[in-house]
Curated annotation (Swiss-Prot):
Protein name, entry field: 2,3,4,5-tetrahydropyridine-2,6-dicarboxylate N-succinyltransferase
HAMAP family: DapD
A biological-process GO annotation: lysine biosynthetic process via diaminopimelate
Residues the entry annotates as binding substrate: R106, D143
Name of the gene this protein is made from: dapD
CDD domains: LbH_THP_succinylT (cd03350)
GO molecular function, one term: 2,3,4,5-tetrahydropyridine-2,6-dicarboxylate N-succinyltransferase activity
Pathway: Amino-acid biosynthesis; L-lysine biosynthesis via DAP pathway; LL-2,6-diaminopimelate from (S)-tetrahydrodipicolinate (succinylase route): step 1/3
Subunit comment: Homotrimer.
Annotated family: Belongs to the transferase hexapeptide repeat family.
PANTHER family: 2,3,4,5-TETRAHYDROPYRIDINE-2,6-DICARBOXYLATE N-ACETYLTRANSFERASE (PTHR43300:SF10), ACETYLTRANSFERASE (PTHR43300)
Length: 274
């Protein structure tokens, strides 16, 4: 792995000249293909948790960006669609039954996953879009018309409901993608973007929009935080009233309660939201 990282880092330093050096390009393409395949298999990932903190592996982002720079678009076809892209689909008309059985995943028509996205066992993918660099851990459901952005990280046993947008990011290199930790529920038509972290066991109601500058308000105390939904929080959309009379209130999201891990396991999602 160290040699792979070294080659990517060296290529990044001369990225603007790569297309002018055909011999260097041939060697580099194999390195980049190996990097994308490592993402595909989940042996490397863009972002990972170390010592209770999430860290970005910038070299992986560089590998993805270099792959875009050095790869020409080509025509792809399946049984009902054609498209022209630099990134091959993870699954195509040529993917056989045994591949799906060995991966222990289920997909339905309209599920689009780009190569370089990792899909763990027992994941169900409804008609949706999962971009390169994304990581979907075991037992998660990606529901209908959800969008998982490039490099977004989704934990184990999550439910990403219909029409939800999970933001991704390739640049700037140091920026974290959206991270949804284990056992989270993201309600339908919600949008989580700009590197927000939703910690383990959190429940996000339907139609909640959270970016890096969205005020996250504890209902009980009035405390305001940004960029992070604490573990086992139950979150709904809300409005912060204006201090000045006659001025409009501003959108926020509200932590209406926090439950412990045991309660979260026992109580149905709908009961928590009510």
């Amino acid at each position: 792995m160290s040699s792979l990282i070294k080659e990517v880092e060296e290529a990044w330093q001369i990225k603007d000249k790569l297309l002018q050096d055909s011999s260097k390009l041939i060697t580099l393409k194999q390195t980049l293909n190996d990097s994308i395949e490592s993402l595909n298999q989940g042996t490397v990932r863009v972002c990972e948790k170390k010592e209770n903190s999430w860290h970005v592996n910038e070299w992986v982002k560089k590998a993805i960006l270099l792959y875009f720079i050095t790869t020409e678009s080509q025509l792809y076809n399946n049984n009902y669609n054609s498209w022209y892209d630099k990134v091959a689909p993870k699954f195509s008309a040529d993917t056989d039954k045994n591949t799906f059985k060995e991966a222990a995943i289920r997909t339905v028509p309209g599920a689009i996953v780009r190569t370089g996205a990792y899909i763990a066992k027992n994941v169900v993918i409804m008609p949706s879009f999962i971009n390169i660099g994304a990581y979907i851990d075991e037992g998660t459901m990606i529901d209908t018309w959800a969008t998982i952005g490039s490099c977004a990280q989704i934990g184990k046993n999550c439910h990403i409901s219909g029409g939800t947008g999970i933001g991704g990011v390739l640049e700037p290199l140091h920026a974290k993608p959206v991270i949804i930790e284990d056992n989270c529920f993201i309600g339908a038509r919600s949008e989580i973007a700009e590197g927000v972290i939703v910690e383990e066991g959190a429940v996000i109601s339907m139609g909640v929009f959270i970016g890096s500058s969205t005020k996250i308000v504890y209902r009980d105390t009035g405390e305001i935080i940004y960029g992070r939904i604490p573990a086992y929080s139950v979150v709904v959309p809300g409005v912060l009233p204006a201090k000045e009379t006659g001025k409009p209130g501003l959108y926020c999201v509200v932590i209406v309660k926090q439950v412990d891990k045991t309660t979260r396991a026992k109580v149905r999602i709908n009961d928590l939201l009510r």
